[in-house]
Regions:
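Alpha-amylase-like alpha-glycosidases and glucanotransferases acting on alpha-linked glucans and related
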Residues: 12, 18, 56-191, 219-447, ...
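N-terminal regions that are enriched for targeting/export leaders
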Residues: 1-14, 30
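Conserved, well-ordered alpha-helix/loop/beta-strand core segments that scaffold catalytic motifs
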Residues: 186, 190-219
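Catalytic domains of carbohydrate-active enzymes, especially glycoside hydrolases
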Residues: 27-52, 287-288
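Domain-scale activation on soluble regions of proteins
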Residues: 38, 164, 171-172, 474, ...
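Surface-exposed amphipathic alpha-helices with a cationic face
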Residues: 37, 197-205, 330, 354-355
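Outer-envelope exported proteins of Gram-negative bacteria
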Residues: 47, 210-212, 216, 290, ...
Length: 502
């Protein structure tokens, strides 16, 4: 698939400006689309839209299919008449406009959304009935999962009573009756989420802006997917994991990363012709124009860590499905636009899988000058970027460009200066030279995190892997979206042949 030179900005929905504690599908989202259009951009890349759980990571969701109710626009619910502006204004979402207070969000948004549901008369809404019927293949299990989880005070499903943990039919029937209105409440949230998201995406597309969605390779252990489909995962007869996902020790983490996600039972997927994965990707393309798949190397080989391990040091590599999976996807769905997140340790077989798939891989500028790299730093030097790639200054997992340059070794900073052949620009302005560097690379697509365009430090970092507590919290202030910055972005995008003229 031929890729035109283009550019975009990475900004999570959660990071949009908003008076209600977190970015959402409100007017601010539509304003950002307009801002992107005027800045000459083609893409808005976001992070996964799933229902977040403990730790607030969008990569650890209660479902591979459900959307995050935090993103539902309260203003839209006011317009519908199921909330009042006074009720929304009275809610305390925290004091900081550039931060997300998830504990307050859980309490205040939850209260308002339940209030909206109670006033909705949703049972007589034909569109809601049609939505539930169309999506029952995932929605019924998800809504029941969330309702039962609430009944068990938020405990992971592997700690529920045996009858419902193992989905015995009498227990399933009992909880569907007992928790009918709780189940309907969670279906209502998904109905409003999809209704509002589809409207926003249609608006973006009408302005020539395409949405790059993002999906993690794995589902969370505490998810409706694992509970409803235990045979597709490496679980024992009691539905307890036998092994979990992660990555091995490297220069960034001496004990590796223990993610804890259940691993796929690939032989079971193969026996169905990879139907679950085909369905998952089909659904993703209902929501997004382009899909980035996180940890793409896991399809070639995946790191298996014994369940119960405290670190990843005892893990080992096992063979994944390889190109066979993507041949099945292409046969079922046709050619679709997928970005392979092929970062980290790269073996020859992983490189071959990316080539065989035809998907563009990712190139991250920050990796090009880091002495902790695993041997592929030259792949990330901009003069080596192939056309069929997507160039980034950094991702949600990296330091902002400004802080990265401040924290690398003196010798590495010298390498950056030498590569740029720029010894005059002040350190605090050098991020602009680095952005221009990848914009003029051969990579067909170039995506810049919003924080890097703004020249922000690590106070605006989205995530620091293997840590909890202060991640996924940064929000953009509306005053930061200036006409001056918009003009500067448009000029650079135009200069390097990436402007969206649509």
């Amino acid at each position: 698939m031929k890729m035109q030179r283009s550019a975009g900005i990475l900004l999570p929905i959660s990071s949009l400006p908003s008076p209600y504690g977190i970015g959402c599908f409100s007017q601010e989202a539509y304003d950002f689309v307009d801002w992107l259009k005027e800045a000459g951009q083609t893409y808005w890349q976001i992070l996964p839209l799933g229902v977040t759980s403990y730790g607030d990571s969008p990569y650890q969701s209660f479902s591979a299919f459900a959307g995050n109710p935090y993103f539902i626009s309260l203003d839209a619910l006011v317009e519908e008449g199921v909330l009042t502006a006074a009720e929304c204004k009275k809610a305390n979402f925290g004091r900081k406009a550039d931060d997300i207070d998830y504990s307050r969000l859980y309490t205040e948004r939850g209260r308002l959304l339940r209030l909206a549901y109670s006033r909705s008369d949703i049972g007589h809404n034909e569109a809601f009935t049609a939505f539930c019927e169309k999506n029952k293949w995932w929605l019924d299990d998800f809504a029941l999962f969330m309702a039962v989880k609430d009944r068990f005070e938020g405990k992971p499903w592997i700690e529920w009573a045996e009858d419902i943990r193992l989905r015995w039919q009498p227990a399933m029937d009992y909880y569907r009756r007992e928790l009918y209105f709780e189940v309907e409440y969670h279906k209502y949230l998904q109905f409003k989420f999809e209704e509002q998201w589809r409207k926003l995406k249609a608006y973006a597309n009408s302005k020539g802006i395409q949405i790059i969605g993002d999906i993690p390779i794995y589902v969370a252990l505490d998810s409706a997917d694992a509970w409803a489909n235990p045979g597709l995962f490496q679980l024992d007869k009691d539905n307890i994991p036998t092994a979990v996902a992660g990555v091995p020790p490297d220069g960034f983490s001496p004990t590796g990363q223990l993610w804890g996600n259940p691993l796929y039972r690939w032989e079971a997927h193969r026996a169905t012709g990879y139907q679950w994965w085909i369905t998952r990707l089909w659904y993703c393309f209902e929501l997004y124009d382009v899909v980035r798949i996180d940890h793409f190397r896991g399809f070639d080989e995946y790191f298996s860590i014994p369940y119960g391990s405290e670190t990843a040091v005892d893990g080992h590599w096992e063979k994944g499905p390889g190109i066979e999976l993507f041949r099945a996807v292409e046969q079922a769905l046709g050619k679709r636009e997928i970005i392979a997140e092929d970062l980290g340790y790269m073996s020859d077989t992983v490189r071959q899988l990316v080539r065989d798939s035809g998907f563009p891989g990712m190139k991250v500028l920050e990796f090009a000058f880091d002495s902790r790299d695993t041997g592929s730093a030259s792949d990330y030097l901009p003069h080596n970027y192939p056309v069929n790639s997507v160039a980034y200054t950094g991702t949600h997992d990296n330091e902002t460009l400004v802080s990265w340059y401040q924290t690398i070794l003196d010798a590495e900073r010298a390498m950056v200066r030498d590569y740029l052949y720029d010894y005059a620009t002040p350190d605090e302005q050098l991020y602009k030279s680095m952005i221009a560097l990848i914009l003029r690379s051969a990579a067909a697509r170039c995506i810049i995190p919003m924080q890097d365009w703004l020249g922000l430090d690590n106070a605006a970092r989205i995530n620091k892997p293997s840590t909890v507590g202060q991640n996924w919290r940064w929000r953009l202030k509306k005053t930061q979206l200036t006409k001056k910055l918009q003009k500067e972005i448009c000029q650079l995008t135009t200069r390097y042949g990436r402007k969206n003229w649509a």
